[in-house]
Amino acid sequence: YSIMLIQFTVENHRSIKNSAVISFAASKDKSFEEYLLHPDEKKALLPVLAIYGANAAGKSNVLHAMMTMKEMVVGNAAKVSKGQKLPWEPFGGTKEPTSFEMVFIFQGVRYTYGFSFDAKKIYKEYLYHWPNGREALIFSRENGVYEFRENVNEQVTLSNRTPDNKLYLVSSNDWNLPQTENAYR
């Protein structure tokens, strides 16, 4: 499997106030084992997922949140200039940041990428991977303070060029940073 979504989490977006999680992790039930996907030894994943619920329960807003995250990473919203507003649509007019997180597997390596933001800035952003089955930080950012494990000097220079309203993952891709290349794809 080249790329596979394991889990998506959204908080404070449109009608979604508290954290909502969409997970492809299979239960321990062995009834349909032959249909499950096994990208690694640890977890079996569902090949499809259904979202169902009452009218106006937020199903479409979960999908909208996924599309907003995608738009901020690879779409037009990724090309923000300094001071430009971000596509922030919080629950009920609250002033709290919106948070998105995605756990996925790319070329056999598990990644966790997430960020929180409002209309003006990115408050928190992080990227972890599990290259040898152990969690390793690629980068994190909280209120403008960055942390890196590799290529520190190059990444510090790049982080200084990243405006408050732009995702560091997008900036690192713009500058062809090898540490974030696979996660960005």
Report each predicted region and the residues it spans.
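Short acidic, glycine-rich loop/turn motifs
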Residues: 10, 104-106, 129
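Residues in well-ordered beta-strands of folded domains
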Residues: 9, 23-25, 103, 116, ...
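Pre-Walker A-like glycine/lysine-rich segment at the N-terminus of P-loop NTPase domains
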Residues: 4-68
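Glycine-centered tight beta-turn/hairpin loop motif at sheet-sheet or coil-to-beta transitions
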Residues: 15, 106-110, 132
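Electropositive, glycine-dotted interaction segments
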Residues: 112-185
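Conserved P-loop NTP-binding catalytic core
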Residues: 37-44, 48-50, 54, 63-122
